[in-house]
Amino acid sequence: MRFPSLILAPILAAATTIAVTAEEVTLPQDEVASLAAFDRLVAVIEHPRCMNCHTSTDFPRQGNARLRHNMGVARGPENHGTPALQCATCHQDNNAPSGVPGNANWHLAPLSMAWEGLDRRGICRQLTDPARSTMTPEQLVEHMNNDPLVLWAWNPGNDLNGLPREKPPMSAGEFGELVRVWVANGAQCPD
Amino acid sequence: MNTPAPTRRQFLFGISAVAGGLLVGLPESRAQTGHGEVTAWVVITPDDTVTIRVARSDMGQGIFTALPMLVAEELECDWAKVRAEYADTNENLTRDKPWGDMVTSTSISVRASQEYLRQAGAQAREMLIAEAAARWNVTPVSCRARGGIVSHAASGRALRFGALAAAAARRPIPENVPLKAPSDWRLIGTSAARIEAAPKVFAEPIFATDVDLPGMLHAAVKNCPTIGGSVVAFDHAAVAGLPGVRHVVQVGKDAVAVVADSWRQANAAVEALPVTWDESIGTGVSNATLRTLFREGLADPAAAIGHRIDDVGASLGGAAQIIDVEYEAPFLAHATMEPQVCTAKVTAERIDLWAPTQNGEGTTNTIARVMQRDAAQIFVHKLQLGGGFGRRGLAQDWARQSVQIAAQVPGVPVRMLWSREEDFTHDYYRPMVLARQTAGFDAQGRLLGWKVRISGSSIAASLAPFWLKEGVDNALMDGFVEEDMPYAVASFEVGVARRDSHIPVGFWRGVNLSQNGWFREAFLDEIAAMRKIDPYLLRRELLSENPRALATLDAAAKLAGWGKPPAGRHQGIAIVEGDNAWCAQIAEISVTDGRLKVHRISCAVDPNFVVHPDITVQQIEGGIVQGLAAALYGEVTVEDGRVQQTNFHNYRYLRMEEMPVIDVALVPSLGRYGDRWGGVGETGLPPLAPALTNAIHPATGKRLRSLPISNHDLRV
Amino acid sequence: MPVLKVNGSPHEIDLPDDTPLLWALRDTLGLLGTRYGCGAALCGCCTVHADGKALRSCVATLADVAGAEILTIEGLGTAATPHPVQAAWLEIDVAQCGYCQSGQMMQAAALLREIPKPSDADIDAAMSGNLCRCGTYSRVRAAIHRAAEFI
């Protein structure tokens, strides 16, 4: 664990400030913490750096405008592009000085893990539905914390115009910890 | 694996031995003058190989095949033994221009040289026949040449060209040899095997980017980000220590270059080089300010009138209904697939250039002027061009820079290559042009008058000021002036107000017809709509006195099935004459949820005569693709003086998945309407944009009056 | 010294690891058939194969291709023994200026290796990263279908 209680403390503090009237019951603290964590972490999931490759289409998108990927690039049978025009035809192990982004194993998330077009509730359902997520909660924590392709979002390099690509709205560590808290407290989804 | 053996022909790209040695890996050196040269055009060696000299430049338009075919038709040689090589630019000067004009622009190669090339073939043939006849002591008229052999039927004797050539070369060159009638051609009009195909398929080092000379250094250039600005200062020391760096130099007033052991090292250093620029020339200039400038030009009462029929003011004044609209065509880049490149070597005695030039003599003259040398000291070795489209003709900035760099490293060959980013941001752009068109109709919808005002930057002003007539560039009115406004209208007027900026403009495929063809043909559809008449029938009506145009138009309509598009699809039509070649096109499209799909382009073209049908079709296909890419996406924009497009991500070009089916019908009129030959390099382009926007109107109800189409919302 | 395997032969290359493969091929090994068009994997002119897969050599560094078998246009076929793609290219007369054609043919060869009888949709998907400013696309498509018949 990289950022233990540092992040957890304010989340719990926020959870305990919910006003409770006589008629209301108090939510279990873990559920509150899980929902609060999801509410914050989803902003990363919805960011173009993540969403452009978690598409619900047979192609990736690119840029903050989320345009269809140039050159007719398609998902292909194994989410690595079509047989002769693979992601790795252009995307190498590292970001290129020319602005072509790179990371080992550059690819699309499978369609079962598509987030595009879903609201926050839908994204959460996707993440927690064993049939679609293809990841256990523990694997999700690992993916969101340590997968080099996920972490690329925080090292996205410059674009083809030489301008820095926008990073997700919180640090990788903060995001990873929120995922951990969300899962540790039951991976609760908003209704 | 079952593969046919390719017909492999030698392809000589005029690489001559120079001080420093032969180019590594390039084909054998060109036949030396005097070795088998029958005439300046035709070289025949004892093994019967016929080498035909090509004076124009090959940039993909197939003239390394088409021009030799014109010679070979009359020479009566064996086509399988024909090779081609560039005529030497320097020799053309020192031998009093035996190869005539070397300019390669305005689709000129075939149409302007066909007659003297056929004559050159006939002359060499007559010299070979005369030599054989003398040896046999018979009359030349009793002999004939065919398939590389001179024969005398009466005696049954025959001699190969290779056995006759050396002696034939000493005979006088006959003048005005009668040429075959077109009906007697056996080679012209066939899709003969291409001379220049194999070196491209087997990736031989035929391009200027491939020049590799012993001891050669590499240069990368950084031009002032605002074109026309200048270098104030640069910090040589900041990059002097970087790997491979040999020299850091200023190039003219507006660029710097790093010369290094490899291009990658040179480019890394030039990108890291701190330069202070003076960009004041472009301060505040943007597309918006240029639009304002050109709009003011459209209203200029002092516009130069290029063509006038009747009194259009009176016609419009009496109109019951008026259309009065403004069209805008953007700047476009050439974006040749091979960025600007040239190798130069400068010594006290001579300057050698290995150049992808559309105009070998233009390169010579530019360098002679800039370097203050005698033109005879300039040796331009032409190579295959990795695309031209007008970028490498009158615009010789790349050749000048390469010599200005090499001159600072005397005696050492330096290959200068621009990065793609430099290439996009320092072009001579297809001009941005505005047109205001006004048409007046009577109460019954009959057309009374058509008035055109054009304003934009002048290519002549940018590249050839001596072409201006009292400051007026008539080319800005191409397609509307008397010679090429084809429509019989009762009252018409076109006028132009030139407005120049610091953005240089140049020749681009189709030149001014690339805008004006669209203005005219798109507006004609607006007229058709007002008259409530089918746009094809309106064109038929207005072209009724022009059987050649009508035949081309009808051929396209027939090919496309005009008026009967498949369900859900829409058609648009246009016809333009470029370089005496008529070209009519019909675009078949659909628009779904605002998404445009171009399904099919049907095209009929009449260049009068066709040398090589397959090359001709290829050129038309090329014009259509370039026109389609430009209409859909092409746009160079300016912000605070700088061009904003830097690479193919922000200057989109057509890709395979967007390709429509292209059907081309060649309908050569074979001299029925005159002797002038047409050129096909450009005529395929101008009709595309109007055919396309004219199809978008019935599909969406929208009249697109600015390009590119991608700037418009096509949702209904 | 790092070894680069190109067209079946090993070459010792004394260049920094971050050198794009394109420049090692062109400037160091003198293999000039692989061409520079954009430097940013936007045009496909520089396409080679790495272990049989299409690769844009302008963005792939020597580190990226360490240990890979590189094939360039020079190793695809020769006039005497053309690759089916090259034979088809000649038969259909695809090339105009020719500058992009090495990349087009290498990309097409990679496609045919994966899909010996490609559909038009397969061709669209494989070839849309290769630009041709002369507009040879229809013929590229026709030649790929023709090459498939040779295989």
Where are these regions (language model features)?
Chain A
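Short, well-structured alpha-helical interface segments that form or flank functional binding sites
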Residues: A36, P48, T82-L85, E174
